[in-house]
């Protein structure tokens, strides 16, 4: 019996050691607080209770990592493109931080081999990208901003993202938004708020996008097409970051469906 206990303890520490070195290889530096990375790799489908009985998973770290990653990318772009305007910087950042890109990078980093997740949801979309963001949040808490920036540059940007190529790619946010609304049976509308002239007497359009009559994003541009694109881009950002807003929009879908019945 005592031998069995020793074998169990030995297997536990062997697994911990293996996980530590796998983490070390991924990070490129030794982790200080190993437990924070374990939490970052713990999907809510495998939540664990802490000593206070509260469920622990990586959702809070994902929230933090998303903000830190966006801030780091903003700094990189601000320095790389000193003469470009806010619209260009925002558009370029959105291409870098989009979920499909983060999903692929997470797999390339090997996060799929370390994540603790229920087999039932492992293939759900964007789980790996979300976990990568939680991982970035863990690095920030463990090592601070500068080390996190170093990780993003050396382990994400340099090997996997060609910023100059991304800049040349055009993202049609209005088309993507329209497809998303069709898929989820959501009413998409664009309303002109006002037209005005700038200092050079050029006409500027201000347009808002509405999802099921909820204001989702406001855009400006020198044509209706440009301002609708900008409003669609702001709407995508809101869809991605504002869960309360999404619930309100989808509540409208359910209400409409029940009325139809």
Curated annotation (Swiss-Prot):
Listed Pfam families: dsrm (PF00035), Ribonucleas_3_3 (PF14622)
Top-level enzyme category: hydrolase
Residue positions of the active site: 66, 133
Molecular function GO terms recorded: double-stranded RNA binding; metal ion binding; ribonuclease III activity; rRNA binding
Principal location class: cytoplasm
Catalytic activity: Endonucleolytic cleavage to 5'-phosphomonoester
EC number: 3.1.26.3
PANTHER family found in the cross-reference section: RIBONUCLEASE 3 (PTHR11207:SF0), RIBONUCLEASE III (PTHR11207)
Name of the protein in question: Ribonuclease 3
Gene name of the record: rnc
């Amino acid at each position: 019996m005592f031998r069995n206990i020793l074998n169990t303890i030995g297997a536990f520490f062997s697994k911990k050691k293996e996980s530590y070195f796998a983490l070390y290889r991924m990070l490129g530096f030794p982790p200080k607080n190993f437990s924070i990375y374990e939490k970052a790799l713990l999907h809510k489908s495998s939540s664990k209770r802490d000593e206070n009985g509260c469920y622990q998973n990586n959702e809070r770290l994902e929230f933090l990592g998303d903000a830190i990653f966006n801030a780091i990318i903003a700094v990189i772009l601000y320095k790389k493109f000193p003469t470009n305007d806010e619209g260009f910087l925002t558009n370029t950042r959105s291409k870098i931080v989009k979920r499909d890109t983060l999903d692929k990078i997470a797999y390339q980093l090997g996060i799929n081999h370390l994540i603790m997740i229920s087999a039932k949801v492992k293939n759900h979309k964007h789980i790996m990208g979300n976990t990568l963001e939680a991982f970035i949040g863990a690095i920030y808490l463990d090592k601070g901003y500068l080390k996190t920036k170093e990780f993003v540059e050396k382990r994400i940007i340099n090997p996997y993202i060609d910023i100059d190529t991304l800049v040349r790619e055009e993202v049609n946010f209005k088309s993507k938004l329209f497809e998303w609304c069709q898929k989820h049976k959501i009413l998409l509308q664009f309303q002109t708020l006002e037209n005005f002239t700038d200092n050079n007497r050029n006409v500027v359009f201000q347009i808002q996008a509405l999802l099921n009559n909820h204001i989702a994003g406001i855009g400006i541009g020198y044509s209706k097409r440009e301002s609708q694109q900008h409003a669609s881009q702001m709407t995508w950002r809101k869809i991605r970051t504002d869960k309360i807003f999404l619930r309100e929009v989808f509540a409208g879908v359910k209400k409409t469906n029940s009325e139809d019945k």
